[in-house]
Amino acid sequence: MRPYEIMVILDPTLDERTVAPSLETFLNVVRKDGGSVEKVDIWGRRRLAYEIAKHAEGIYVVIDLKAEPATVSELDRQLSLNESVLRTKVMRTDKH
């Protein structure tokens, strides 16, 4: 298991109350493959540095998890297929 941090920028037209339940469906991919979700931090609506898909704002979510590389790539693939996800960034957070 490796530690990862995933930043997800969601469509700002979403209701912020529905963000956590909709993310749970994606995070179940990690749990099903034996990984663990350490922390889900919903930052809320923030201004983007530049427009993405004609949106000047986005709902930021940061997820800390431990999983296998194949599981994380599958999670990233599923997030990118979702229309409400504007952008994702996956980083390995090895602590040296």
UniProtKB/Swiss-Prot annotation:
It comes from the Bacteria. Signal peptide: none annotated. PANTHER family: MITOCHONDRIAL 28S RIBOSOMAL PROTEIN S6, SMALL RIBOSOMAL SUBUNIT PROTEIN BS6M. It holds the Pfam family Ribosomal_S6. It comes from Mycolicibacterium paratuberculosis (strain ATCC BAA-968 / K-10) (Mycobacterium paratuberculosis). The keyword S-adenosyl-L-methionine does not apply. GO terms for cellular component: cytoplasm; ribonucleoprotein complex; ribosome. Belongs to the bacterial ribosomal protein bS6 family. One of its GO terms (molecular function) is small ribosomal subunit rRNA binding. Gene3D superfamilies: 3.30.70.60. Binds together with bS18 to 16S ribosomal RNA. Keywords: Ribonucleoprotein, Ribosomal protein, RNA-binding, rRNA-binding. HAMAP family: Ribosomal_bS6. The keyword Cell membrane does not apply. InterPro entries: Ribosomal_bS6, Ribosomal_bS6_CS, Ribosomal_bS6_sf, Ribosomal_S6_plastid/chlpt, Transl_elong_EF1B/ribsomal_bS6. This is Small ribosomal subunit protein bS6. NCBIfam families: S6. One of its GO terms (biological process) is translation.
